[in-house]
A protein has these predicted regions:
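Short coil/turn linking the two alpha-helices of tandem helical-hairpin repeats
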Residues: 165-166, 172, 235-239
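Conserved, well-structured interaction surfaces
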Residues: 47, 55-65, 89-168, 184, ...
Length: 269
C-alpha cells in the first residue's frame, strides 16, 4: 500500500512539474524564420529589411506576373501615364492592359487599378515597419546607421505615394502599423500627401550617401532623392516650389558623379 502511495505521489509530482514548465515550453523562440521582432535587432537586420524594400520597388516592372509579382499581365505606371497624352501612342499591336488608359475607359474593375494599389501599399507598409522598429533599436554598428536605413525607407515610402497620387489623386496617408487590422481608411487630400512626400524626400536627401562608389551597386544615393524632389516640387506647384525644383535638379546636373548623355549610343549612334 505504501508503495502504491509513493507511485501516486511520484506521478502527481511529475504532472505538477510538467505543468509548471508548460509556460516556458510554449514560448516561441524563432531560430529558422524571420519576423520583425527577431530581425530588426541589429544593423544587419535592417539591411535585410531594406533589401526587401528594393525588391518590392523593383517588382513594379515585373509586369507579367513572374515569381508572384504585383503587376499581372499589365503595363507599368510610366506607360499608362503617357499613353493618353501626346508623349506616345499605341502601335498596331494593341496591349490590352493599355487600352483602358488609351481610350479613357478605365473603371474600378480594371485589373491594373487593384494591382498597383496593392503594390504601393505593400511597399508603404514595409517601409513603415522598418521605420517604427528603427526607433526601438539601439544596437547599431555605426552611429549613422539608424538615419541611413530610415532615409532608405522614407525614400521608398515617398516613391510609392508619388505613384499613388498620380494614379488616384486623394489617397490615405499611413505611417503606422495598424493593430488591430483596419480596412476603413479615409482618403487624405492630394496636396497634404504631396507635402508628406516632400518631407520624406528632404530627409532622404539629407541622410543618403552622396558618393555612389561608397555604396553597393543599385543602392540609393542623395541624388536619387534630389531628382525625385525636383519632380515633386514641380507637381505641387506651391509658392516657391518651382525655385526649389530648379535647385534640386541643378544639384543633380552639377554633381561630379553623373553627367547628361551628350551622344547617341547603340546602332543609331
Amino acid at each position: 500500500m505504501k508503495t502504491m502511495n509513493y507511485i501516486k505521489i511520484g506521478i502527481a509530482s511529475s504532472i505538477l512539474s510538467i505543468a509548471a514548465g508548460c509556460t516556458s515550453f510554449l514560448e516561441e523562440d524563432l531560430k529558422s524564420s524571420l519576423a520583425p521582432d527577431n530581425t530588426y535587432t541589429s544593423s544587419l537586420g535592417f539591411e535585410v529589411g531594406a533589401t526587401g524594400l528594393y525588391a518590392i520597388a523593383r517588382s513594379e516592372y515585373n509586369t507579367w506576373g513572374e515569381n508572384g509579382a504585383f503587376m499581372h499581365n499589365g503595363a507599368c505606371a510610366y506607360e499608362v501615364l503617357q499613353i493618353s497624352t501626346d508623349l506616345c501612342r499605341m502601335g498596331t499591336v494593341r496591349d490590352g492592359s493599355l487600352v483602358p488608359f488609351a481610350e479613357m475607359t478605365l473603371n474600378p474593375s480594371t485589373l491594373f487599378v487593384g494591382s498597383y494599389w496593392n503594390w504601393a501599399y505593400n511597399l508603404i507598409a514595409s517601409a513603415n515597419e522598418l521605420l517604427i522598429y528603427s526607433e526601438k533599436n539601439d544596437n547599431w554598428d555605426y552611429p549613422t546607421d539608424k538615419q541611413l536605413y530610415q532615409a532608405e525607407a522614407r525614400f521608398f515610402r515617398a516613391y510609392a505615394y508619388r505613384t499613388l497620387v498620380y494614379l488616384y489623386g486623394d489617397v490615405p496617408w499611413v505611417e503606422t502599423i495598424q493593430k488591430p487590422f483596419l480596412l476603413s481608411f479615409s482618403r487624405d487630400p492630394k496636396i497634404e500627401v504631396q507635402g508628406n512626400i516632400i518631407k520624406d524626400l528632404e530627409f532622404a536627401k539629407t541622410y543618403l550617401p552622396d558618393n555612389p562608389d561608397n555604396v553597393k551597386e543599385g543602392k540609393l544615393t542623395t541624388w536619387a532623392a534630389r531628382h525625385l524632389l525636383s519632380e515633386m516640387y514641380l507637381l505641387r506647384g506651391a509658392e516657391g516650389d518651382y525655385k526649389l525644383a530648379e535647385e534640386n535638379a541643378q544639384d543633380v546636373i552639377d554633381c561630379p558623379y553623373y553627367s547628361l548623355m551628350k551622344s547617341r549610343f547603340g546602332n543609331a549612334k
